[in-house]
Amino acid sequence: MRAERTSFLLALGLLVAGIRSVHCLPENVVVKDQHRRVDGHTLASSNTDFAFSLYKQLALKNPNKNVILSPLSVSIALAFLSLGARGSTLTEILEGLKFNLTEIQEKEIHHSFQHLLQALNQPSNQLQLSVGNAMFVQEELKLLDKFIEDAQVLYSSEAFPTNFRDSEAARSLINDYVKNKTQGKIEELFKYLSPRTELVLVNYIYFKAQWKTPFDPKHTEQAEFHVSDNKTVEVPMMTLDLETPYFRDEELGCTLVELTYTSNDSALFILPDEGKMRDLEAKLTPETLTRWRNSLQPRRIHELYLPKFSIKSNYELNDILSQLGIRKIFANADLSGITGTADLVVSQVVHGAALDVDEEGTEGVAATGIGIERTFLRIIVRVNRPFLIAVVLKDTQSIIFLGKVTNPSEA
């Protein structure tokens, strides 16, 4: 019965920009391309669809607030959880992640995430990016060998025996792990843990990159940012003259500027016309993103004004995931693929995120500039009102960060 079912918590997605991390794939795990998997485009499309669906729900629940999340991190964590799901619980998770199960098999999805994780963790001189998964397991809880093997091989998961009966000690252990992995950026992911907890799954993404054309700190000045019609705040406003991908979308009423990192990954800044934010949010789809990316063209922006900001978030996603059709994991779940018995349910889904944007990128040193072309149209872009930001990895077309900055002065 429900009251007797054992609960466990799922900690989703720690996106931390502007910090250091030491996690990497285990050296003894060799990924072999022996299995059919979802092609990169299909995986990216499903992940993008889920990203916008998740963002819209968070934006509705947090009106007029900053919204910061790592949709890719949430996708990976839910896919990781689905390793242990069976029956309709499994179907709900995968369909909630926007996979068409009439065209894609479960094993293909897992192998696609395996290859995505391998690609994300490839070492690079120009980008610091790592993805980590960890399990904190009640000391006497016996996991199925198959689940342990798949967790390690497919999702590169670490495992730590934990005494959840001493819930405060367990909470400190997990929070300290997260704090260490995020160099102190996220200090308290869990504010409470039940002594009945059996298993905690943690996923995080760490991203650090430098602008290809950095802003000069000498040109950063205090300027007005219009939070709403009746509220204005003073923020440090960076400024730059550069050639960069640009698109004016008259149909949706917004201006797009793409700033490239030295790794050729990019941050897409989307500035809606005044009063158009909600209309624009409603039209966020994978097709819209594809149209935008295909429409971006190099343009000389004579004056780009962008606020410098550092913002954090901490969300409980239970209600939001239920809105997206993922309900059974919270009650009447079949997670028998974890222990062999269907006595586990998810009691709490937590997602923490943080992002720093400054003159050098997401913390780093100045990078090489790019050439500037002459143009007769003088373009000035002032990002001085609420805007959207998406950080996209070029090679995998993955949105690792998606958010809305309503007030840059709020951490």
UniProtKB/Swiss-Prot annotation:
Q: Which UniProt keywords apply?
A: Cytoplasmic vesicle, Glycoprotein, Protease inhibitor, Secreted, Serine protease inhibitor, Signal
Q: What PROSITE patterns does the database record attribute to this sequence?
A: SERPIN (PS00284)
Cite a single GO MF annotation.
serine-type endopeptidase inhibitor activity
One Pfam family of this chain: Serpin
For this protein, the record's InterPro entries field holds: Serpin_CS, Serpin_dom, Serpin_fam, Serpin_sf, Serpin_sf_1, Serpin_sf_2
GO cellular component terms given for this protein: chromaffin granule; cytoplasmic vesicle; extracellular space
Q: Which residues form the signal peptide?
A: 1-24
Residues at the site labelled Reactive bond: 377-378
Q: Where in the cell is it found?
A: Cytoplasmic vesicle, Secretory vesicle, Chromaffin granule; Secreted
Q: Which residues are noted as glycosylation sites?
A: 100, 180, 230, 264
> Per its database record, what is this protein's job?
Serine protease inhibitor.
Q: How does it assemble?
A: Homodimer.
Family according to the record: Belongs to the serpin family.
- Name assigned to this protein: Serpin A3-2
Give the organism, scientific name: Bos taurus (Bovine)
